[in-house]
């Protein structure tokens, strides 16, 4: 299990940090500790660089934002931990996260071998597979 280390990553640095993390994962070298990846990868949510004032209506802005972000929102680590604590799954129960993103929930499960997840964001899936190699992630 990776420790939750609160991070304050400036909005302007998030895309750069995400790309460095993905480069490290794709290179196959342990260039960045997995715990740092868990705490620093933020996905594409909020990285759209769109301004509402550039659109005729809020609806048009929201649609453009949705198209870029694919509706992505990573549940905060603390919320994932607390939800798993409340559910208290046993190590024999199978868990499915149908929008697993980077696999935040998997970090707190008692048995990674019984964790299943999928996501439409291939970059988030790559991070999830790296962080939780025993989980079944597509």
Predicted regions and their residues:
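Class I S-adenosyl-L-methionine-dependent methyltransferase catalytic core
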Residues: 1-138
């Amino acid at each position: 299990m990776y420790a939750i280390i609160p991070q304050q990553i400036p909005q302007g640095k998030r895309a750069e940090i995400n790309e460095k993390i993905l480069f490290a994962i794709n290179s196959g070298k342990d260039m960045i500790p997995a715990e740092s990846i868990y705490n620093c990868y933020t996905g594409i949510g909020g990285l759209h660089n769109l301004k509402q004032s550039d659109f005729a209506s809020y609806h048009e802005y929201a649609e453009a934002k949705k198209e870029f972000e694919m509706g992505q929102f990573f549940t905060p680590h603390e919320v994932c931990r607390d939800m798993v604590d409340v559910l208290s799954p046993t190590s024999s129960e199978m868990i499915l996260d149908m929008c697993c993103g980077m696999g935040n929930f998997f970090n707190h499960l008692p048995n990674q071998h019984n964790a299943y997840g999928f996501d439409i964001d291939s970059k988030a899936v790559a991070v999830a597979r790296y962080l939780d190699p025993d989980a079944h992630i597509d």
